[in-house]
Amino acid sequence: PDEDDARTGTPFHSYWLGKIGNAQIGPIYLGKLGFLSLVCGLVAFEIIGLNMAASVNWNPIEFLRQLPWLALEPPLPEHGLSVMPPLNEGGWWLMTGFFLTTAILLWWVRMYRRAVQLGMGTHVAWAFAAAIWLYLVLGFIRPVLMGSWSEAVPFGIFPHLDWTAAFSIRYGNLFYNPFHMLSIVFLYGSTLLFAMHGATILAVGRYGGEREIEQIVDRGTASERAGLFWRWTMGFNASMESIHRWAWWFAVLCPLTGGIGILLTGTVVDNWYLWGQEHGIVPSYPEVYTPAVDPAKGG
């Protein structure tokens, strides 16, 4: 279309890339949205990197050594939902969040528009939207509902993992959160379905099983053999078309249910362990021994 930009780059081929996929590299369509997305993402990445470098006094050796532990922390609790806290007390984090979120949303619009322009369905864009939902819950929606940006996740490799562990402990163990349970079911289920489907197609590759579109509309010996295998081993088989719907929904429901579970934590449920006891998920154990006294609290 006239409003679109030209594709960029001259296509070339890679022998080694051909071993794992299509050997052709390029051209790529970036467009205005893609360009703006990359610019915003670069700004966010730069703010994070410079703040981490400043935290080690601009020492490049210490920066590389401590990189997994460095963080850009959200605003302090006393700043609440202020949109202009001091830069060194969370202002940089807010600025980073703005640019990173803008980059992600622009990239989503770009993916959606490319799919429409190519006459495809928009399944990839909506799957990406499920991941964006979880990202927004963690960094924007839940902190707003809790009334403080300090509830959000820090930027950093180990710091965000530490935040996850502390978050679970603070709210009585997320393992008892039913939506967390569902999220894990869909996470493990996705890997299982992917492994089953990938293994099946490889197993019938000698019969042209990789030509899945043909097999969907005109089932051949590859589909028949694959179907027989699964009926013989577990009594049921998906079709060449339905397995992709199974995989798509399992993958999408992982971040969707996870986001719901995070959103309910602290806003609706303060302690998932006690909630589980009240609803028959967690057994209530009787006190058999006298509780031990913490020596650190002794006089």
Where are these regions (language model features)?
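Transmembrane alpha-helical insertion/packing segments
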Residues: D2-M111, F158-H160, S168-I184
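Long, low-complexity, intrinsically disordered extramembrane tails
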Residues: E3-W16, V43-E46, A222, A226-L228, ...
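Cytoplasmic membrane-interface regions of multi-pass membrane proteins
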Residues: G9-I25, V56-L67, L72-L76, L100-A127, ...
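Loop-to-transmembrane boundary segments
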Residues: G18-G41, L118-F128, Y171-V185, G227-I260
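Hydrophobic alpha-helical membrane-insertion segments
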Residues: L36-A53, A125-G147, V185-L192, L253-L263
